[in-house]
Amino acid sequence: MDYGKHPVQTGCLLNFNIMGNYDQYFEANRELWNQRAIVHKSSDFYNLAGFKAGETVLTPIELNEIDDVKDKKMLHLQCHFGMDSLDWARRGALVTGVDLSDTAINEARILNKELGLTAEFVCCNVLDTADHVKSQFDIVFTSYGTIGWLPDLKPWANMIARMLKRGGLFYIAEFHPVVWMFDDEFTHIKYAYENKEVIVTENQGTYTDRNADIRGKEYSWNHSISEVLNALIGSGLTIESFNEFMYSPYPCFQQVIEFEKGKWHIKGMEGKIPMVYSIRAVKQ
């Protein structure tokens, strides 16, 4: 879970084809996620105490769409401070988690040791995963607020194909690009559906605490469904399934109302817009 975009912000758009070098963007995002990791691990939103006591943090969406993971090698991309990774490890998966934030990875390693689990955590840019993780996996997994931090999905998809064993599964559950078109309060459409430019935002707070002492610029990109699917297909993966969900399993947006336990709508748009999608793709 790496929710991210639109906590409390003002935004502007830049043409990233002109900007060229993304390193400065990745570094700014890393610094911001280092701040967030400290706040998030102590938040009610993540309920770390409940997780330590045995509660699951995975949602019915991914649990219903991924088969038994026992003894399967799983690579978790953009794992934040490791709760989802360690939940999969509890279910028997042999997990390696990757994240850009060194603070988050350090917290993940501490939590892994505290829980007596055997997951491994690697700090690197997700696009450089193949340079840092020298094995292939039965499952590559990523979820909720991850791909928006990447300017181009073709290198991402190629990396995924490289990291998968033949016959391996790639699975993503992600917030729907329609959600990212709106302003913070969901009053009007502010951003393009397609990946046209980098979205630069001045942030205050985070989705677990709008008043947290977290400030800084972040850089993100919107990705259409066709861009995601075509990147995966172009990498040689075969799409097995694509599903859309008319709710969010997390209250990480403003103006949300819980209409059923563990399911949230945007107030005034109840059941009218897709909020999450999932994809299963396999390496033949």
Model region roles, listed by residue range:
Residues 6-14:
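Intrinsically disordered, low-complexity segments enriched in serine/proline and basic residues
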Residues 16-70, 83, 87, 169-206:
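Conserved class I S-adenosyl-L-methionine
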Residues 73-129:
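Class I SAM-dependent methyltransferase SAM/SAH-binding core
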Residues 131-140:
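A short acidic, Gly/Pro-enriched loop at the edge of an enzyme's catalytic core
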Residues 154-169:
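A short glycine-rich, Lys/Arg-flanked "PGG" loop and its adjoining helix->strand segment in the class I
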Residues 208, 219-242:
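Short alpha-helix
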Residues 235-237, 258-284:
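Core SAM-dependent methyltransferase catalytic element
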